[in-house]
Amino acid sequence: LELLTVYLGERLGLYQALSAGGPATSAELAARTGTVERYVREWLEHHAASGLLEVDDPAAGPLDRRYRLPPGHVPVLADTGDVRYQAFNGTEIVRAARGMPQVAEAFRSGGAPPPLTWAPEGRPEFNRAVFLNLLGRQWLPAIPDVDLRLRAEPPARVADLACGTGWSSIAMAQAYPLISVDGFDLDSDAIEAAGRNAQEAGLAGRVTFTAADAS
């Protein structure tokens, strides 16, 4: 149940609005996010009862209570660029739940359930912040021979197998300006998203993606 309410907070931008705009009443948060006050009030009260939010004055009336996102919760619930960010788990739970009827049918038929579609929730980017913050800055530099080769001439060409939406490829290209990276994945939707991500990162010239079986 908590993760389902986290899904709402992530999907509707409620956490980011509290983090960026500071404490708010239910009406203020609804105005910031283009949502309905009555529903937002229920979400705020539930989150306060569960300890995810704090209330300035619990004795205040329902419409006067101001809710805040504690500083220690911001990296986990509001900052998508932080390696501790976890709000995407609510999205993944909702997305996975849509496929459960097909899983139940597979129990009866012995077949395989179809792959989960991305719509309407989208694909949680579980590894995005970790790759962008750690792969090229800590993990690869911790392997001296690999780090040296990636920095040296002639420029290395790297194959990134099962690259998903491309964040590992992008992180390597950002950390090592000489290299080129070829990402491969079976998931054509992921490859399409990876191409967009590389374009937005300004790396389309050095990072390419192909939907292919690399086995």
Task: Give the residues covered by each predicted segment.
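Conserved Class I S-adenosyl-L-methionine-dependent methyltransferase catalytic core
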Residues: L1-L12, Q16-A17, R41, E45-P155
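Conserved SAM-binding loop of SAM-dependent methyltransferases across substrates and taxa
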Residues: T165-L178
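Conserved SAM-binding strand-loop segment of SAM-dependent methyltransferases
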Residues: G202-A214
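A short acidic, leucine-rich amphipathic alpha-helix
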Residues: S26-T33
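Conserved SAM-binding motif I beta-strand of class I
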Residues: S180-D185
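Conserved class I S-adenosyl-L-methionine
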Residues: E153-G164
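Conserved SAM/SAH-binding beta-strand->alpha-helix loop
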Residues: D187-D189
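Conserved SAM-binding loop
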Residues: A194-G195
